[in-house]
Structures are given as structure tokens and as C-alpha cells.
């Protein structure tokens, strides 16, 4: 035990922590980032949030567990959080956001003295992160997806079948009649999609329900959630959703992104229905990458990154972190 304490003390004595939060210029506008970690020598993990517009930078305590092993970079994209607060008329068009992200990755490599960084995309962010990796694979030691998107068409059909089965089992005649009248869902019809998917709350995984309850409490107690910021956060998600809707309705990564030139990992909640795990697995199977691995987390839903942090971190440390360390040693 004393040896363990001595080792920990030695680590703390030699570590160089980093805690920064500021605007940087990306794509010609000021965008908000935070950089937090226990030691600048650790691999850099750039988080690409979903939503669209669901900035995570204010949720510092939620992601603190990752900071011992990684330097965590949160980025409020165009249309999100503090970036939206400063630039309310800069639409988060996917191509533009991907180019912003590549610019940020280059900045992080330079500023933090890394040859490559790790990238983690959640939900809609997995779509953007895949785009970034395809455009500039040389910047990334590995890709990690969670709440991984795949085929939007398959996504909609899987969700529809799930909702209809649950509604029938619950004898919810209103939902059953609505969905039976639709018959086969049209993946290009956003209004139709939201008419039935908006009624999903009773059937959400328990872990996701708890996350939303925890988030409400955090918003009430977190000093970063000022009235101004909270309004920008909500308005940004609405703005981002409207701007990116056409791209979301056309997501077909199994067709458009089959070849990934960096190690490819999917760490997915087994009960995810927002980006159905079965659809994510279908995409994973067709991807060709130098190395790939699928990790399913039991009892987790769409937000495994924050609801099952210990399991998620263990997977990152075991499978992903070594690749980032190796990339720094390679010539």
C-alpha cells in the first residue's frame, strides 16, 4: 500500500496538468474549447458532441473521470453552446463543421506537441468525426464512435419496429393506430418521423432516463449554466437541428464511409435505440480499417459515455490509449 502511495506521489510530482477554457479562431470565427487533463503528456482525446448542437463543455464534472488518462478537449461546434452565443448566424453545415474540426485537430497537435490525437464522436458527432477522419486521417491515431450512426434508412425502420412492438405490448391504442396508419416509415419525411419518434420516452432505456434526470439536476446546480448560457444552449440545438436536418435524413455511412484509414472502434450501449445498436453493428461489420473492435456495454443506452463511465474508460485505456502512445513513438 505504501509503495502504491509512493508511486502515486511520484506521478503527481512529475505530471503537468492543464486546465484551459477559451475561444480559438476556426473557420474564420471564434469557437469555444476547453482543454482539461491531469498531465499534458497524456494522449489528447477530442470529443465531437452530438445533438446536433448538444455542447458538452459545461459538464466538466461529468467528464472528469477521463482526465487522469487523457487530455480531454471539448469543442462547442458552430450552432452550439458558447460558440452559438458568440456567432448566432453561423450555420453548422456538416462540411463546414468538419473543416473546422480538422483545423482544431491541427491546432491541438501543434499546441500540445502531439504527432496525432484521438477523436471520439457521439451520435451526430460520430457522423462528423467520420468525415474528419476521412478528410485528414494523418491527424488521428484512432477513431472511436459511440451512439454510432450508420444507415439512416435502417435506423428509422429499426426504431419504428421497436416503437410499434412496445406500443402493442402496452396496449397503447393511440400510438398503434398512428403507426399502423403509416405502415412503412419514410426515412426522408422528417415530419412523419417526429410524429411517432417523439413519443418514445416511456420506452427509453433506464440508463438514458436517469441521465436526463441527472442532467436536469446539474443544470440547476452548475454555475456555468447561467440564464444566458442555458438559453443559448437550447436555442443552438434548435438552430442546429433545422440546419442539419437534410444531411441527417441522408446519412448512409455503410455506403459512403466503408473505408477508414485509421484504427476504428465502436463502444456502444447495448440498449441504444436513438442510434440502434443493431444498425451500428451492421455498419461496423462493413467497415474496412487497419484495425477495428466493437465493444458493447451492458445495460447502457445512447449515452454510455456518461452513464457507464468506468466501463467506457476501461475500454479506452485497454484498446485505444496504447495506439496514441505508439503514434508518438513512431517515426
PLM feature spans:
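A catalytic-pocket lid/entrance helix-loop region that shapes and gates access to the active site
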Residues: 138-186
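Conserved alpha/beta-hydrolase "acid-adjacent" motif
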Residues: 273-279
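Conserved alpha/beta-hydrolase
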Residues: 67-85
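The serine-hydrolase catalytic nucleophile loop
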Residues: 52-64
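Conserved acidic catalytic loop of the alpha/beta-hydrolase fold
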Residues: 98-116
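Short beta-strand/loop motif that positions the catalytic acidic residue
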Residues: 260, 266-268, 272
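Catalytic histidine-centered segment of alpha/beta-hydrolase-like enzymes
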Residues: 300-313
Amino acid at each position: 500500500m505504501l509503495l502504491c502511495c509512493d508511486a502515486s506521489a511520484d506521478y503527481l510530482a512529475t505530471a503537468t496538468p492543464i486546465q484551459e477554457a477559451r475561444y480559438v479562431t476556426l473557420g474564420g470565427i471564434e469557437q469555444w474549447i476547453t482543454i482539461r487533463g491531469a498531465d499534458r503528456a497524456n494522449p489528447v482525446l477530442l470529443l465531437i458532441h452530438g445533438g446536433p448542437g448538444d455542447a458538452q463543455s459545461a459538464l466538466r464534472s461529468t467528464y472528469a473521470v477521463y482526465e487522469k488518462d487523457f487530455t480531454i478537449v471539448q469543442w462547442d461546434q458552430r450552432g452550439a453552446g458558447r460558440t452559438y452565443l458568440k456567432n448566432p448566424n453561423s450555420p453548422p453545415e456538416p462540411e463546414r463543421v468538419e473543416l473546422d474540426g480538422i483545423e482544431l485537430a491541427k491546432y491541438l497537435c501543434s499546441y500540445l506537441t502531439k504527432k496525432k490525437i484521438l477523436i471520439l464522436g457521439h451520435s451526430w458527432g460520430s457522423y462528423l468525426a467520420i468525415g474528419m477522419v476521412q478528410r485528414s486521417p494523418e491527424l488521428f491515431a484512432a477513431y472511436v464512435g459511440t451512439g454510432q450512426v450508420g444507415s439512416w434508412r435502417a435506423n428509422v425502420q429499426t426504431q419504428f419496429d421497436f416503437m410499434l412492438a412496445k406500443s402493442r405490448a402496452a396496449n397503447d391504442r393511440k400510438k398503434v393506430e398512428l403507426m399502423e396508419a403509416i405502415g412503412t416509415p419514410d426515412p426522408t419525411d422528417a415530419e412523419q418521423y417526429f410524429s411517432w419518434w417523439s413519443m418514445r420516452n416511456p420506452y427509453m432505456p433506464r440508463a438514458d432516463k436517469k441521465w436526463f434526470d441527472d442532467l436536469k439536476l446539474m443544470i440547476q446546480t452548475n454555475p456555468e449554466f447561467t440564464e444566458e448560457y442555458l438559453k443559448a444552449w437550447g436555442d443552438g440545438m434548435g438552430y442546429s437541428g433545422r440546419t442539419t436536418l437534410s444531411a441527417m435524413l441522408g446519412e448512409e455511412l455503410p455506403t459512403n464511409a466503408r473505408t477508414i484509414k485509421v484504427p476504428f472502434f465502436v463502444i456502444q450501449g447495448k440498449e441504444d435505440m436513438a442510434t440502434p445498436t443493431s444498425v451500428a453493428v451492421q455498419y461496423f461489420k462493413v467497415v474496412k480499417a487497419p484495425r477495428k473492435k466493437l465493444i458493447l456495454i451492458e445495460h447502457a443506452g445512447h449515452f454510455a459515455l456518461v452513464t457507464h463511465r468506468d466501463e467506457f474508460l476501461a475500454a479506452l485505456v485497454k484498446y485505444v490509449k496504447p495506439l496514441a502512445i505508439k503514434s508518438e513513438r513512431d517515426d
